[in-house]
């Protein structure tokens, strides 16, 4: 079966729904932990599930280069390879190619680059990206696009967006009769009119879901919110809406307020490894000396394995001594915190108390609720 999206209820622009796959149901709004190389760094699949994750993200670009789809297919597909029995979304490789900067060359055909592993010259095209994602057995496949850099002139952003639209058409053609869901990615830089053209082009082609790409690439927060505010309400109502690569807990709340259903970001896992831990009142920098003698848990309100079993002083000690257990315990906590933010939003939407949830979320942080335009 292909993915089925059900929209249950709304509160303002915030949406409560679910995506139904053969491998399970994903209640939305949802956060997807990033498992770039077939692993959420330092975590077993069971531990990731225990945080509340319903779906995870894999990286086409990296998995194509190493270990390669041939080895993955010897196990079945990516689910079997990494022992994850829930849905997987794979990104197309477009963003990673964008990250290579000067090491890549973009043409109408695709992107040519040197493998960061062995220097081999590789051509990644929309067709190749679809083929690799099919071999990975992805449940949600992302089209191959060019992530518009920031800053970009309107002419540069237009040219990039138009190329992405042509690649979207080719991605859809190559995807063919595959049972996996195929999502289009809206580009257009920081220009509303280009975002509109991109969205219209993608909806004319027709996809199972739509993502906002090209944000969280170094632009000021105001620009991100401006584009999100403009674009999200125009996205098809009966299809999932995905904001790629975002963000902090506050960003998730603000994006849900504006109608987004899905998120992914490395922030909870990467910040965990750097000792930056999210709690209901803000961020704890566990490396700081103030935690050296603190016997209290990281977050009194958290039900994660870390908070139930260890003190701030112990986590501080692990961080200071560079013990790998520290990164693991921190990651368990941060991922659970993110999943709890999402499940609390879902519960509030179910109960019709979403506005109250938002007020309490910001009250705990000593912040006022940002205005919706």
Swiss-Prot record:
GO molecular function annotation: metal ion binding; tRNA-guanosine(34) queuine transglycosylase activity
Keywords: Glycosyltransferase, Metal-binding, Queuosine biosynthesis, Transferase, tRNA processing, Zinc
Binding site for substrate: 91-95, 145, 187, 214
Pathway given in the UniProt record: tRNA modification; tRNA-queuosine biosynthesis
Cofactor binding annotation: Binds 1 zinc ion per subunit.
Enzyme class name: transferase
Active site annotation, chain numbering: 91 (proton acceptor), 264 (nucleophile)
Protein name: Queuine tRNA-ribosyltransferase
């Amino acid at each position: 079966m292909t993915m089925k999206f059900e929209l249950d209820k709304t509160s303002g622009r915030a949406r409560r729904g679910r995506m139904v796959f053969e491998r399970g149901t994903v209640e939305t709004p949802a956060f997807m932990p990033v498992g770039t190389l077939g692993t959420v760094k330092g975590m077993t699949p069971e531990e990731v599930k225990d945080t509340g994750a319903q779906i995870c993200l894999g990286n086409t670009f990296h998995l194509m280069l190493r270990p390669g789809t041939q080895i993955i297919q010897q196990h079945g597909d990516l689910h079997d390879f990494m022992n994850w029995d829930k849905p997987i979304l794979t990104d197309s490789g477009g963003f990673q190619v964008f990250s290579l900067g000067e090491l890549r060359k973009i043409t109408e055909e695709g992107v040519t680059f040197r493998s960061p592993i062995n220097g081999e010259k590789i051509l990644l095209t929309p067709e190749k990206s679809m083929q690799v994602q099919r071999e990975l057995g992805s449940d949600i496949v992302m089209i191959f696009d060019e992530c518009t850099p920031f800053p970009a002139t309107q002419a540069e952003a237009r040219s990039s967006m138009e190329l992405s639209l042509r690649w979207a058409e080719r991605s859809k053609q190559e995807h063919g009769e595959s049972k996996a869901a195929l999502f289009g990615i809206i580009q257009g830089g920081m220009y509303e009119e280009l975002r509109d053209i991109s969205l219209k082009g993608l909806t004319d082609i027709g996809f199972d879901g739509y993502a906002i790409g090209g944000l969280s690439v170094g632009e000021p927060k105001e620009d991100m919110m401006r584009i999100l505010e403009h674009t999200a309400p125009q996205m098809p109502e009966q299809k999932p809406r995905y904001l790629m690569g975002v963000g902090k807990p506050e960003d998730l709340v603000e994006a849900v307020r504006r109608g987004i259903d899905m998120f992914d970001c490395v922030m909870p896992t990467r910040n965990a490894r750097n000792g930056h831990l999210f709690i209901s009142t803000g961020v704890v920098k566990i490396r700081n000396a103030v935690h050296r003698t603190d016997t209290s848990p990281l977050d009194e309100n958290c039900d994660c394995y870390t908070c139930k079993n260890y003190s701030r002083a112990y986590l501080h000690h692990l961080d200071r001594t560079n013990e790998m257990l520290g990164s693991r315990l921190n990651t368990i906590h941060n991922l659970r915190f993110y999943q709890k933010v999402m499940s609390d939003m879902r519960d509030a939407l179910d109960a019709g108390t979403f506005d109250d949830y938002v007020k309490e979320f910001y009250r705990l942080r000593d912040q006022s609720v940002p205005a919706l335009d």
